[in-house]
Amino acid sequence: MPLPPPKETSTALVTGSSSGIGAAIAAELARRGHGVTLVARREDKLKALATEVADAHGVRAEVIAADLTDDTARLDLAGELERRGLTVDILVNNAGFTTMGPVHLSRRDQELAMVRTDVEAVVDLCTIFVPGMVTRHRGAVLNTASTAAFQPLPGQAGYGASKAFVLSYSRALGAELKGTGVTVTALCPGPVETGFAEASGLSDEEASESLPRFMWVPAERVAAAGVEGLEAGRPVVIPGAANRFGALAGYYAPKSLVLPLLASQHPALKKARRD
């Protein structure tokens, strides 16, 4: 099913769009003529990207700085869009982060913030914006999950479980919406060159210890695959042949074999054992 056609009063809401995959998805949608609303905490970065995509593609690019761990901020986001006269025809739930290391050494505040961003915000924004899409008989939702969704992930236990939730939720929501004119796609990238792991306390070298470089995919390629999958109405998109193979292997292989291997190779667990 084609994406909803661009309109002056419609927008593609992209969370986590100040950098990485989110910024690349916003640029890809703008390249296709869609106005975008960029949402993240860093207003300075959002403004710079908004200027860039507006100048490059001649689309309306809005900026709303918000902390999506806060449910009040999510409701305020909906109200602000209404005040600006915009309806959300494309929703991209991309905001997210990971914690790394064994659970017994984790920080409670960080673990809960991750769940609020990676899980709660996805559910809340779908609950807020999907009803309007159904009423208008047009809309598309792209939820960023991960290849970590296909098997438990020692060393990132909460993150893997969060992304498994996003994948399951997206597939169920897509089935519920069949025939309404609204589609749902789960984007499941493998490792992406975005500084994501480094922001979680690991260097790129440490993060790539357990994953060969040929599995890493540029953010722009992930974004293009995600938007193409969204336009085609695919329920799941896994960019990169190596990552598709890895996801299937992780899903079908006996967990009694997979989990000890993952635990032994995860760089955060290696680091914890050394420390």
Predicted features and spans:
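Conserved glycine-rich Rossmann-like NAD(P)H-binding loop of the short-chain dehydrogenase/reductase
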Residues: R32-L49
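Conserved NAD(P)H cofactor-binding loop of Rossmann-fold oxidoreductase domains
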Residues: N94-T99
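Substrate-binding pocket helix/loop in short-chain dehydrogenase/reductase
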Residues: P102-V115
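Conserved glycine-rich cofactor-binding loop
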Residues: S18-S19
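Active-site helix of classical SDR
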Residues: C126, S162
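Residue(s) in the substrate-gating loop at a strand-loop-helix junction
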Residues: S146
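SDR active-site lid
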Residues: G179-N243, S256-L259, K270
